[in-house]
């Protein structure tokens, strides 16, 4: 054989594997096509699901929009109906008002604006009367409730727990306990005024009653510092002509007085018809003295044949505790020892007793320097017409040597001026050697602070009582 033929035969078996690679490629292409079809099917399913969800969302949104539109339509229709119903009513009221005003204007002859103004004033007056009546009724009701049962007291409120609910709404058991204990606490509060120790000795030979104010204790604190400046007034009821005062004890709630006062010319038969009064006051230089309490001892209830010494609780009083309301006066004192000059400045008076028929007075003030029952010097202020609270601010000077200042008395008298008849004294204050209580304290403060004016309020005393004191100076 030729060599070329041999090569052809050899080359044929080498070219036979080519058909085997063709079916593998076909398989790969088939797999790719299958995958693509699967992916396309999944994509179509996803698209269909998304389209379904979108359609459902669109339907829900359309339903919500329809509901909102229906509610808005109903609201607008209701508003339109209300406005349509309210407008005619308002128009009717306005029409009636115009007709009424025109009728009133025609009958009275006033302009329409005048009629409208009168109607408004009438409505305001009626409304004010109704408001005043309601407020007065509520005020009376509050006062009645305050005087009635006390369900919860301040102590129980303070003892409540830290929980806010307990503070706002306490338990019913606590309320009932407080209601039951209300009377006992009222009694305890009445006993917080303190008590007084005194001694009584009656002398049948001289027909005199010696009263000793020994001490007091557990007095209430009336000053800002938690203390008081107590003093005691002693007098007999019903005449009240003779009154005595103890010294003022500064900043104490348990003062010790140990002062004795004697009521002379008091027969035993007359003493049985009288009541001995101990009135305790808190001294205040610049305002009216506050009464702490009092002790009343009817002499017919005790045995005057023996010496009596006892403690008694103070009782609260309304008003002045038997003291006449003559008024108060404020004046200042200044003494210069080197020059022997006493200056009295009458500042003002207040709440004076009504002396005239019209319920007023024409007050002026007389100032007198007295020694041994004799009047050495006198001066007086101007007259203030028709007033119970006169203001003077008038200064007066007296020459009083230092050797004589301890022997004189300064008598300040408020007098009601009368053009026709005699002028009547309203009340009086006595300072100096015969002064007692607050008057003596004022005089002592003046001497202790030379060259400096000392101002103080004083309660006016009965002129008849002070006349007896001045007579005893002789």
From Swiss-Prot:
Its main location: membrane. Residues 1-49, 63-84, 170-189 are annotated as: Disordered. This is Synaptotagmin 1. Binds 3 Ca(2+) ions per subunit. The ions are bound to the C2 domains. GO terms for molecular function: calcium ion binding; calcium ion sensor activity; calcium-dependent phospholipid binding; phosphatidylserine binding; protein homodimerization activity; SNARE binding. GO terms for cellular component: axon; dense core granule; exocytic vesicle; membrane; neuromuscular junction; plasma membrane; synaptic vesicle; synaptic vesicle membrane. It comes from Drosophila melanogaster (Fruit fly). It is a single-pass membrane protein. Its cofactor is Ca(2+). Keywords: Calcium, Cytoplasmic vesicle, Membrane, Metal-binding, Repeat, Synapse, Transmembrane, Transmembrane helix. It is found in: Cytoplasmic vesicle, Secretory vesicle, Synaptic vesicle membrane; Synapse. Residues 69-84 have a biased composition (Low complexity). Residues 30-49 have a biased composition (Basic and acidic residues). It comes from the Eukaryota. The gene is Syt1. PANTHER family: SYNAPTOTAGMIN, SYNAPTOTAGMIN 1. Ca(2+) 1 binds at residues 223, 229, 282-284. Changing residue 383 to V: In RNA edited version. Residues 135-474 are cytoplasmic. The chain crosses the membrane at residues 108-134. Residues 171-187 have a biased composition (Acidic residues). Residues 186-434 are annotated as: Phospholipid binding. Homodimer or homotrimer (Potential). Identified in a complex with Syn and nwk. Interacts with StnA and StnB via its second C2 domain. This interaction may mediate its retrieval from the plasma membrane, thereby facilitating the internalization of multiple synaptic vesicles from the plasma membrane. PROSITE patterns: C2. GO terms for biological process: calcium ion-regulated exocytosis of neurotransmitter; calcium-dependent activation of synaptic vesicle fusion; chemical synaptic transmission; clathrin-dependent synaptic vesicle endocytosis; larval locomotory behavior; liquid clearance, open tracheal system; membrane fusion; neurotransmitter secretion.
